[in-house]
Amino acid sequence: MIGRLRGIVLEKQPPLVLLETNGVGYEVHMPMTCFYELPDAGQEAVLFTHFVVREDAQLLYGFNDKQERALFRELIKVNGVGPKLALAILSGMSAQQFVSAIEREAIVSLVKLPGVGKKTAERLVVEMKDRFKGLNGDLFNQSSDINLPATAKQTTSDADSEAEAAAALVSLGYKPQEASRMVSKIAKPGADCETLIREALRAVL
């Protein structure tokens, strides 16, 4: 199992990052809350990974620390929650925000996440609440505010950034029309793709 990768960021296409390690490029799926913290292309990054083998694909999911990965692994143990839905959940909420929502039994907040209906939200609360006792460390000390790296630069047109952001939201489980509408509502001149995704996800919660 591939549990950790250290390498150079080659490409960032939310929610995917291409990381080169020893001449091999690894395509890694990341929750947007983790993706925001990646360095720019050409810089080194370290990711803690979870490897999934399916009949039709082998997939890597990446996280900034072990606590985030541990939360992802607990999520996919919940009945009806697979890696794709877990990724969407942790893209819409930071680890700390999700833990808080579960502890407060905030069903109303959880159902705003893509792919999470009332029954799934209730199941998450029931199955996850007691599991957090075994998860400790930075997971409970992270700020709920998500800040983009100061080095992030605008390199594409506004239209390209908006299209990229909408495509990323679709990959997280939102319907195309819904994703476009979410981006349109918060679009600002000069905003890059990552900023648009972050603001669109914040707006629905």
From Swiss-Prot:
The gene is ruvA. One of its GO terms (molecular function) is ATP binding. Belongs to the RuvA family. It comes from the Bacteria. One of its GO terms (biological process) is DNA recombination. This is Holliday junction branch migration complex subunit RuvA. NCBIfam families: ruvA. Has three domains with a flexible linker between the domains II and III and assumes an 'L' shape. Domain III is highly mobile and contacts RuvB. SUPFAM superfamilies: DNA helicase RuvA subunit, C-terminal domain, Nucleic acid-binding proteins, RuvA domain 2-like. The keyword Membrane does not apply. The RuvA-RuvB-RuvC complex processes Holliday junction (HJ) DNA during genetic recombination and DNA repair, while the RuvA-RuvB complex plays an important role in the rescue of blocked DNA replication forks via replication fork reversal (RFR). RuvA specifically binds to HJ cruciform DNA, conferring on it an open structure. The RuvB hexamer acts as an ATP-dependent pump, pulling dsDNA into and through the RuvAB complex. HJ branch migration allows RuvC to scan DNA until it finds its consensus sequence, where it cleaves and resolves the cruciform DNA. Its main location: cytoplasm.
